[in-house]
Amino acid sequence: MTNVALTGLARDLARRAEEGRPVRIGVIGSGEMGTDLVTQGMLMKGVEICAISTRRPHTARAAIRIAYGDEAMAREADTASGLTAAIEAGRIGITSNELLVTNPLIDVVIDATGKPGVAADFDLMAMEHGKHVVMMNVEADVTIGPYLKHQADRLGVIYSVGAGDEPSSCMELIEFASALGYTIVSAGKGKNNPLDHDAVPDDYVEEATRRNMNPRMLVEFVDGSKTMVEMCAIANATGLVPDVPGMHGPNAGRDDLAKVLIPRADGGVLSRKGVVDYTIGKGVAPGVFVVVEATHPRIIERMDDLHVGKGPYYAFHRPYHLTSLEVPLTAARIMLTGRPDMVPLPRPVAEVCAVAKRDLKPGETFDAIGETCYRSWTMRAEESRAARAVPVGLLEGGKVLQAVRKGEAVAREIGLD
C-alpha cells in the first residue's frame, strides 16, 4: 500500500471490485502471453482472469503456478456447468475454447494464440454469445480484422486490438499528434532483434530456451515477420501505408528519426508523407515513434524552446511497450467506457503477404509463420492485389501448387490448395 490516491481507471476498477463486479476475462491460449495475463490480472483490482482455454491443460496449470506460486486456483472443467461452478468459486477454469467463449459469466475474451484460424472460429463465436473480444493475435487482425470488426458492430459488442503491443502503443502517439493538429509523416517501431530473413527455429532453440520462449515465436521476430504484421496493423487502423514493399527499415537512431523518416526532398528516405515503417537504429527499440510536421512559426518556435527540435519535423518516442502486461487495461476500458483501444478500418490499405525462405516444391505443406517455409512481407493493398499475393494468415496448412524459389512471393497460382 502507498499513499497514492486511486484515480481514473484504477479508481473505477477498485469500485467494481468493492461492488463484487470484477471485469471477468477468459483467455484463449496458455503460452507465454497467457501466462503474463494470468499473472498481471492477479495483481489488478477489479479484474479477474477467470478461465483459460487450451488443448494442453498442463500449460494452463503452469501459468497459474507461475502467477500464484501453486495450482490451488486451477480447476479443470469439461462441462459448461463445471466451468460456471469454477468461476463462481473464484477459481480459474481450465477448459475448451467452445466452453470458454459461450460461458455467460465471462465479459471479455482475450485471444492470445497468434493463430488466425482460432480467431475465425472462436472469436466470432464469442461475439455471437455477447462477449467483447480483445485481440492479441495480430496475425489474425491483419487477415480478418475488418470482418471481425464488422461482425462486432452487427452483434452489439466491441472488438479491439489489445494495448501493450507496438501497434496499439504507436496508436497512442498517432492519436496524440493528430489531435494536436500535426501532420503525421511516419510512424512505427524500433526492431528489437537483429534482422535475419533466413532464420529458422532449429537455429534459435538455445536462445529461445534462455529467454523462456517458443523458438517459432522467437523466429517470427528475428526474420522480420512480426514487424511486418505489426506495421500492417497500424496501417489498416490509420490509413498510413508502407512507402515501398517491405518498408525501408533504415538504420536510424532515436535522435535521427526526424532526419531520416521524412520525405526525400527534405533529406530523408520517403517518397511521401503518411507512412508506416520501422528502424533498426539504436535507442528506438523496444519503443515506438511518430514523426510529425509542424508548419506554424509559433509552434516551431515553442518546440525549439522546449528542446524538442528545430523543426519542422519532430519525433515523439514512447520508449517501451509492455506487451501482454498491458492488455487487461483494454478489457477494463471496454467494460468501463465502451470504447476500444484500436480497430481496423473497414477496408485495408495494406496486406501482409509471404516470401519463400527456401525453395518450395509442389505438394509441400505450408508451415506456420516463424517456421521454415516463408516470412511475412508487407505492401500496399493495391500492390498485393496486382501481385495476386496470398495473405500470410491463410497459408498455414495449405499446399504448394507450383515450385517457389527462395525470395519469391507466394501468389495464388502457387499456393493454396
Stretches with model-predicted labels:
Residues 58-59, 140-145, 149, 166-170, ...:
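Short gly/pro/ser/thr-enriched loop/turn and capping motifs at secondary-structure boundaries
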Residues 1-123:
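N-terminal glycine-/serine-/threonine-rich beta1-alpha1-beta2 phosphate-ribose binding loop
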Residues 152-156, 160-226:
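Rossmann-like NAD(P)H-binding beta-loop-alpha module
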Residues 64-65, 145-148, 171-176, 189, ...:
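Short acidic, glycine/serine/threonine-rich loops at helix termini
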Residues 113, 117-129, 136-158, 162-164:
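Rossmann-fold NAD(P)-binding glycine/threonine-rich loop
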Residues 30, 55, 114-115, 131, ...:
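Short, ordered loop/turn segments at secondary-structure junctions
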Residues 3-14, 206-207, 211-417:
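C-terminal catalytic/substrate-binding lobe primarily of soluble NAD(P)-dependent oxidoreductases
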